[in-house]
Amino acid sequence: MKICLIPARGGSRRIKNKNIKNFFGKEIIYYSINKAFRSKLFDKVIVSTDSKKIANIAKSYGAEIFIRAKNLCDNFATDLDVIKNFVNHYKKKIHMDYLCYLYPLNPLLTISTLRKCKMLLDKGKCHKIIVVSKYNSSIERAFVFKNKYIEFWKKQFEQKRSQDLKDFYRDTGTCYWYNLNKIPKFNKKMNFKTKAVVLNTFEYFDVNTLKDWNVLKKIYKYKLYLKK
């Protein structure tokens, strides 16, 4: 069975009710649920939450609900903890082939990217797929502060041409895919063989503050404009 798991904890320190905050007429979690269904990649779309309000909203959009363990409802629970809790609960009830861990603040992510992840996972030879974006400039020429002065992080790259520097990538925190047929047991020490899909421009934006939220709205509005 192919599962999409969307984590949506009720508590949020910096933006109140962030996972169900109104975003162009819909709770923002709607966009992840809707894209999961429209992609036609999953047998089940499940929201992991501790909130009755979030559960009711997610149900109204067609998602199933998994009430997560109480010890996974604070700011210290990791994504792997949440996934492990879900997999251990369901593995005796249903056979899971793969799992997509899709974040709820994903209005920019495209269905095309979800399908690319699935295709890459289907090719095998890996346990996990992550979604990344390339840094605009190489971190080999990054600076650090030392004793109130600034200097190159790696002195040997100071005179290198930009075209001779390596490309570096960052985790976008949009979704993770796991081939559960190749993962007998989840644990923090497991070394996942991981491949990546590189995102196009304007497919993700980190939202940690209300200022970030307002920027996200502008990017989304611009994407809607480009589609006209």
What are these regions (language model features)?
Residues 42, 94-96, 123-126:
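Short, high-confidence coil segments that cap the C-terminus of an alpha-helix
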Residues 46, 52-100, 108-112, 116:
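Short phosphate-binding loop-to-helix
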Residues 1-48:
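N-terminal glycine-rich phosphate-binding loop and ensuing alpha1 helix
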Residues 41-46, 127, 202-203:
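Short active-site oxyanion
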Residues 107-199:
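Conserved core of the sugar-phosphate nucleotidyltransferase
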Residues 41, 61-62, 146:
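Short, structured coil segments at secondary-structure junctions
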Residues 185, 197-198, 202-228:
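Hydrophobic helical membrane-anchoring modules
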